[in-house]
Amino acid sequence: MFRAVSVGWKKYWWGTGVLPDRTNRVEDIYLRFYNGSTCEEYVDMPLDQAHRLFDIKGFEKNNPTVLYMHGFIETAQQESIQVMVSAYLESRPDTNVILIDWSNMAHGSYLVNAARNTKKVGAATAEQVHKLIDAGLPLDKLHLIGHSLGSHVAGYLARELKNKYRKTVKRVTALDPAFPAFYPDGVVMEHIVDKDAEFVDVIHTDAGGYGAPVRTGSADFWPNGGKSVQPGCPRFAPVPLSDDNLCSHWRSWRFYAESVRNPEAFPASPADSYHKFRENPSPEVGMVYMGANCDPSARGSYYLTTNAAPPFGKGMEGIYYKKKNKKATNGKNNMK
């Protein structure tokens, strides 16, 4: 096992080179527009042919548009993408859902290849999104969502639109943005920040592990404290990038997808720390919803608790932290 762990981390950082079927070129980034009611109905096109979207049946340019950016070593068939896309197609069918498939540049070495490619992918995508906006796509209805490395792709995309094309995105959602190589800021790459869009909301579920260790948005949400191990995830999962090892990191997109279907599933309470949240006698004061329907005026850190399995949302119960009072319990037992 320990040899597997060692080999796993070496592959994570240094990789095995670009995979044979991966070109590592921005010219081979694809857009996948889901034009049906399931994840199996879609149209793929090269990024530089984004203008074709306007001619595809099912694409309504005046409707809300979500651009989703996946994470490290993911492909278009990954569970995270299927879960996120299905939530929108089934619950919000009036939304244009588009995957930025940069899997050709998200493989190989994390440090040498994938992390450094986030800026290239963001810039290349921004150029095409800029053209779509000039052709009539409403900027105020554009929502960028990214998971892990995809969060930083979304940040670079929004930053490029703002700085180069003078177009400010209304909202970027970062789902447990990747930690290694991005924090502290500039250690290798620059990370997503609150100034990248009018509103940047962040969901932390593996802070200090695979995910960002600090606040990085306009509003940062810390379910169950925001760290590993999230409820329902294995406590011992030493093999890097295994499903068990990624469980807490993946909770971010599972929570968000659930919020698309149930916008009031995850009330969150403002607090300076998880400890203060647990001690707060009035957590409903300043409460906002984490996820799809988050109030864009929210600022600061917010906390909540979740269930260990779907449905993860507890509703209002999630902001009332229940303490185990062993003394009280023992006292009652002694009185019997």
Where are these regions (language model features)?
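Active-site nucleophile loop of the alpha/beta-hydrolase fold
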Residues: 170-181, 204-207, 226
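The conserved beta1-alpha1 loop
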Residues: 69-71, 147, 176
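Active-site signature of alpha/beta-hydrolase-fold catalytic machinery across serine-
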Residues: 83, 156-160
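Glycine-rich nucleophile elbow surrounding the catalytic serine of serine-hydrolase chemistry
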Residues: 145-157
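Flexible, membrane-associating and regulatory peripheral segments of lipid-active enzymes
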Residues: 1-99, 105-117, 126-139, 164-167, ...
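Alpha/beta-hydrolase fold nucleophile elbow
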Residues: 136-148, 172
